[in-house]
């Protein structure tokens, strides 16, 4: 499998969305940029903010689409074309309702699972053959409560758990960058004792 060259965090732009559950993908790439000393800059031709990060001997592009979540694919596909990156070399970090806070999971391929940023990306690519980092935000219990849930802020305990999941995913990332996704998944998916 190809090594990763582009890591995208999904979220909604603007300070009013900064700490919402829906911005778990932004939270991941922001933490990654902070840990590696990468600096964000606006890139209008890619419809987002970009940074170049050096991680475990690999140079990787980071992207935060400045479009709203539902239009994330526009930014992602523009970046893939501009940097001549194959979808298989892409990792998209996003919030995941079906995982509890404190849980993060890597996966390759599949559908959008109702996540609108993934939906738009899959629509524009014509397939779902790319890597995902699913950051658990929990589910409110009923589908009618999903929109206010994802657009709301997590409580203190859930927020800390989401932060721990982000840190664990960053710790597993060097294995994925080496193209060793099975080992990265094993490290991330195995409960700590």
Curated annotation (Swiss-Prot):
Protein's GO biological process? protein quality control for misfolded or incompletely synthesized proteins; rescue of stalled ribosome
Site feature (Discriminates between blocked and unblocked aminoacyl-tRNA) residues: 12
- List the molecular function annotations (GO) for this entry: peptidyl-tRNA hydrolase activity; tRNA binding
Q: Per UniProt, where does tRNA bind?
A: 17, 68, 70, 116
Recorded hits in HAMAP family, A to Z, give: Pept_tRNA_hydro_bact
Q: Which NCBIfam families match?
A: pth (TIGR00447)
Q: Please give the family membership noted in the entry.
A: Belongs to the PTH family.
Protein name in the entry: Peptidyl-tRNA hydrolase
Species per Swiss-Prot/TrEMBL record: Xanthomonas campestris pv. campestris (strain 8004)
């Amino acid at each position: 499998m190809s090594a990763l060259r582009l890591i995208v965090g999904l979220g909604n732009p603007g300070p009013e969305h900064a700490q919402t559950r829906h911005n778990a993908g932004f939270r991941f790439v922001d933490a990654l940029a902070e840990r590696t000393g990468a600096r964000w800059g606006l890139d209008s031709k890619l419809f987002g903010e970009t940074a170049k990060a050096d991680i475990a001997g690999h140079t990787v592009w980071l992207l935060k689409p400045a479009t709203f979540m539902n239009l994330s694919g526009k930014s992602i596909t523009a970046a893939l074309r501009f940097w001549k990156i194959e979808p298989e070399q892409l990792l998209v970090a996003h919030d995941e309702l079906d995982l509890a806070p404190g849980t993060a999971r890597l996966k390759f391929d599949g559908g959008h699972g109702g996540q609108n940023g993934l939906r738009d990306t899959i629509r524009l690519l014509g397939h779902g053959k790319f890597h995902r980092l699913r950051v658990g935000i929990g589910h409110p219990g009923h589908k009618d409560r999903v929109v206010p849930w994802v657009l709301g802020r997590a409580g203190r305990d859930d927020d800390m758990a989401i932060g721990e999941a982000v840190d664990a995913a960053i710790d597993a990332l060097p294995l994925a960058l080496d193209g060793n996704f099975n080992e990265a998944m094993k490290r991330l998916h195995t409960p700590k004792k």
